[in-house]
UniProtKB/Swiss-Prot annotation:
This is Profilin-3. Keywords: Actin-binding, Cytoplasm, Cytoskeleton, Lipid-binding, Nucleus. InterPro entries: PFN, PFN_euk, PFN_sf, Profilin1/2/3_vertebrate. Its main location: cytoplasm. The gene is Pfn3. GO terms for cellular component: cytoplasm; cytoskeleton; nucleus. GO terms for biological process: actin cytoskeleton organization. It is found in: Cytoplasm, Cytoskeleton; Nucleus. PANTHER family: PROFILIN, PROFILIN-3. Testis specific. SMART domains: PROF (SM00392). Belongs to the profilin family. Interacts with ACTRT3.
């Protein structure tokens, strides 16, 4: 998809989504596009490496960081064939649902608005990564 800015705007039309980022995960582990001024623009290459790395056990026990915010993992099927989604929640008083979707070249990261249930984001990410996968093939 050539126009990530338009894609980000389209995703943010959903009032349940507060922030979104498209992040490369193979050759170029950086944020390709995100909401201007959004928290997810700060996702680091190291965080991408942890998300897509082979050691699933450690971050399931200790949690992980997304854009510097500590998160606890609720469900990890990010690298599972046919699913490709990880559900997490930020730690702290302002806990928000975070959902990460896996495509062949990029991760789609969504953060819900305060009070939005993670299951809603999970369904949205499944729909969005399905569309991205079709465009890549």
């Amino acid at each position: 998809m050539s126009d990530w800015k338009g894609y980000i705007s389209a995703v943010l039309r959903d009032q349940r989504i507060d922030d979104v980022a498209i992040v490369g995960h193979s050759d170029n582990r950086c944020v390709w596009a995100s909401r201007p001024g959004g928290l997810l623009a700060a996702i680091s290459p190291q965080e991408v490496g942890v998300l897509t790395g082979p050691d699933r056990h450690t971050f399931l026990q200790t949690g992980l960081s997304v854009a510097g915010r500590r998160c606890c993992v609720i469900r990890d099927y990010l690298l599972a064939e046919g699913d490709g989604v990880l559900d997490a929640r930020t730690k702290g008083l302002d806990g928000r649902a975070i959902c990460v979707g896996h495509t062949p070249r990029a991760l789609l990261v969504l953060m819900g608005r305060r009070g939005v249930h993670g299951g809603i984001l999970n369904k949205t990410v499944h729909d969005l990564i399905g569309g991205l996968r079709e465009q890549c093939s």
